[in-house]
Amino acid sequence: MLRRGLMLAALLLPLSGAAAAGEADEAAIRRGEYVFNAAGCYGCHTDVKAKGAPLAGGRRLKTPFGDFLGPNITPDPEHGIGGWSLADFTRALREGISPAGDPYYPAFPYTSFSRMKEEDIADLWAWLQTVEPADRANDPHELAFPYGWRWLTGVWRALYFTPGDFVAGDPPAIVAEEDREKWERGAYLVRVSGHCGECHTPRGVLGRWMRISSWLAIRLAPRVAPFPILRPIARLESVAGVWRTLKVIWKLAWTRTVISPVAPWAR
């Protein structure tokens, strides 16, 4: 009888292990969807105007250097990231290097993603595997001379790109000690996964952040609406400050990017 029980337990162990692994995968996928929405991947990798397939690429980003076309990041093995490994994906986000070893243009905000936690990258990768593959070839960027010379990106990286882990730093005095953890979480979302500063901070001639002007409005190209100022100019206790805060909360919670499909709340 004991022998039968042991045999039955041995047979059931793989099944229980598979169930536990399945639950872990589902949890990773749910977390990955959260990271996906926080990072705003949909906005740059979906051609909403042309009613393109989700994450199939083609979204045009106008800049002073020319137009960048978002690539296909569906699991399609030929045109998307279906042939990538998690290590390839991690290197792309944290180092800005493609699986072929080519540097990405910093229009892809790896300068912020480089500080993303590895567990967040793994979760995002797990969720992307659930996306419907799209057999859509990537469009070449349409850049002004001489920015089409990709080797120049290496010079830019040497000057302005410093990878590393995220360090929140000390919160301002207005943040209560009991809210420190929330502030650090918010700082991570804003500076890293949300990469808000990439669009809301002015840049110099070569695309370097003008950090003294962090969170001020920026216009990427002529005839393109500027991104709004994110600094808390008006105090919260004033009528203007309360109204401004309510507008930000409303946009983050309810809108679906009426102004621009680039913002992270596009979904």
Task: Report each predicted region and the residues it spans.
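Bacterial N-terminal signal peptides
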Residues: 5-16
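Electrostatic cytochrome c docking/interface patches
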Residues: 18-37, 160-191
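Sequence context of c-type cytochrome heme-c attachment sites
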Residues: 30-33, 46, 50-79, 107-111, ...
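The canonical Cys-X-X-Cys-His
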Residues: 32, 38-48, 89, 124, ...
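Electron-transfer interface patches adjacent to heme c in soluble/periplasmic c-type cytochromes
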Residues: 60-91, 111-121, 213-255, 267
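Extended intrinsically disordered, low-complexity coil regions enriched in Ser, Thr, Gly, Ala
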Residues: 83-88, 98-106, 203-208, 240-245, ...
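Membrane-embedded segments
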Residues: 87, 96, 101-127
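Extended, well-folded interaction surfaces typified by the phenylalanyl-tRNA synthetase beta subunit core
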Residues: 136-158
